[in-house]
């Protein structure tokens, strides 16, 4: 294929849906704030908007095209300001497929192609393209990678080396979520409670003052009648939040499965829109295992990938803030499944050695020095402010106690280690390959130096920036063990 070809005609529909996704929230908020006008006037407004959107989508589609050759593909776009994007197959680092349910009968997918340019978003976005064309692109890309690996084997030195065996000869599914696991993931996702709270605050800003006053009066009257209303409202809020989380999880992670083939992880998921993400092993900088307080009680965990490049940042637009290798899995089978998926890392449960146990006061001293006097002073003027500050201080001390007691590390092999700490009440274990660490930083103060204490920070590439994995208030001998580990030749 060497001549210019337009995208699939369904691109027009996708352009319209994309525009609606951006404008519908403002339309709904406007209706809530001002109410409906005359029926014909409303119909005229919506009809005119739909016509303009359709015309814009058709014009945009007409000015979009692409060409595919054996050595590169070229994307042409732009109505007034013309743009020509030329991408060779050697520069393609990852290809992400997305397929809405209405695209399935037409054998059409959307593509996002990330290159070695290091942009914060995929360099190439193809709204709709036939699957046969995608297979052609993938064939050329694989051929280019094989040729590059054969001609320049030294460039592959930093990649994970996996011997060819029957295990990797075919792309077999290594792990797949059940519907029960998806629902369990939803009801244990504590972030959804904060999300609903933020949505309610946003809606309140755009509601008319009369509505807000009426709701406030009803709430105050109900609270004055007794605490039963508060309990009932709390239960209702939790039920709604869990239902919302379960629906969101089912839409996002339905038919979630992970497979491995030729040094590439493939993650598939999605109910209304199917996502297929291919991740080369050399792009994986590390692995994070997370357990919030609720999941720890239930004995389940989540596994995230730390990726270099910009593709995972695009996930925010899909309400998924990270790339999950295993959204939810029982602790009893966690490491056996990781070993099956990611065989070259030789995953095993780490034996964590604590490095800051008994030093909780160092973690909390500045919070105590600032918040405690403020809380005491506030009680003389605004008791409610003093209460909030005191509760915040107690919360901070509790998390610092947890972190200081459990922060630690484990040396897994000659080239890998695990660092454990707590982010509030969530346990985080970060598995790091020595070759992926960009730099090591040791910091201290004159006071801490006299106590033989310092902080250690390991920097990894994450997205287009850096991830700092920190260990705080470590003894000098523990820091020396880590620095010797990184200085030792493989």
Residue ranges with predicted function:
Residues 1-490:
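N-terminal basic, Ser/Thr-rich segments that initiate or prime the first beta/alpha elements at protein or domain
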């Amino acid at each position: 294929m060497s001549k210019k070809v337009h995208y699939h005609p369904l691109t027009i529909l996708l352009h319209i849906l994309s525009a609606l996704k951006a404008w519908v929230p403002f339309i709904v908020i406007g209706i809530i704030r001002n109410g409906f006008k005359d029926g014909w006037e409303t119909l005229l407004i919506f009809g005119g908007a739909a016509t303009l959107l359709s015309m814009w989508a058709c014009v945009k589609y007409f000015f979009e095209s692409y060409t595919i050759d054996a050595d590169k593909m070229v994307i042409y776009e732009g109505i007034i300001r013309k743009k020509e994007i030329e991408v060779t197959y050697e520069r393609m680092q990852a290809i992400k497929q997305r397929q809405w349910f209405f695209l399935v009968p037409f054998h059409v997918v959307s593509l996002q192609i990330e290159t070695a340019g290091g942009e914060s978003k995929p360099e190439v976005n193809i709204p709709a393209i036939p699957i046969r064309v995608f297979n052609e692109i993938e064939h050329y890309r694989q051929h280019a990678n094989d040729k590059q690996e054969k001609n320049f084997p030294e460039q592959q030195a930093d990649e994970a080396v996996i011997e060819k065996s029957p295990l990797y000869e075919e792309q077999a599914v290594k792990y797949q979520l059940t519907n029960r696991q998806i629902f369990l993931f939803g009801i244990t996702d504590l972030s959804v409670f904060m999300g609903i709270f933020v949505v309610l605050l946003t809606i309140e800003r755009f509601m008319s003052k009369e509505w807000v006053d009426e709701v406030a009066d009803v709430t105050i009257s109900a609270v004055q009648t007794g605490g039963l209303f508060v309990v009932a409202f709390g239960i209702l809020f939790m039920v709604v939040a869990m239902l919302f989380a379960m629906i969101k999880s089912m839409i996002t992670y339905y038919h979630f499965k992970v497979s491995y083939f030729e040094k590439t992880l493939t993650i598939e998921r999605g109910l209304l829109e199917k996502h297929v993400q291919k991740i080369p092993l050399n792009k994986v900088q590390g692995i994070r295992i997370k357990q919030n307080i609720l999941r720890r009680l239930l004995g389940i965990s989540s596994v995230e990938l730390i990726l270099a490049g910009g593709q995972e940042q695009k996930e925010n637009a899909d309400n998924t803030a990270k790339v999950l290798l295993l959204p939810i899995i029982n602790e009893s089978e966690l490491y056996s499944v990781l070993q099956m998926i990611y065989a070259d890392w030789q995953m095993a449960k780490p034996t964590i050695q604590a490095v800051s146990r008994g030093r909780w006061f160092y973690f909390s001293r500045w919070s105590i020095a600032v918040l405690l006097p403020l809380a005491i002073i506030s009680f003389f003027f605004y008791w409610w402010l003093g209460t909030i500050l005191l509760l915040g201080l107690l919360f901070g001390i509790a998390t610092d106690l947890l972190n200081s007691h459990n922060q630690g590390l484990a040396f897994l092999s000659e080239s890998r280690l695990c660092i454990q700490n707590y982010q509030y009440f969530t346990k985080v274990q970060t598995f790091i390959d020595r070759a992926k660490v960009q730099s090591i930083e040791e910091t201290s103060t004159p006071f801490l130096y006299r106590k033989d204490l310092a902080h250690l920070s390991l920097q990894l590439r994450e997205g287009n920036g850096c991830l700092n994995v920190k260990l705080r208030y470590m003894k000098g001998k523990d820091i020396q063990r880590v620095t010797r580990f990184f200085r030792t030749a493989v």
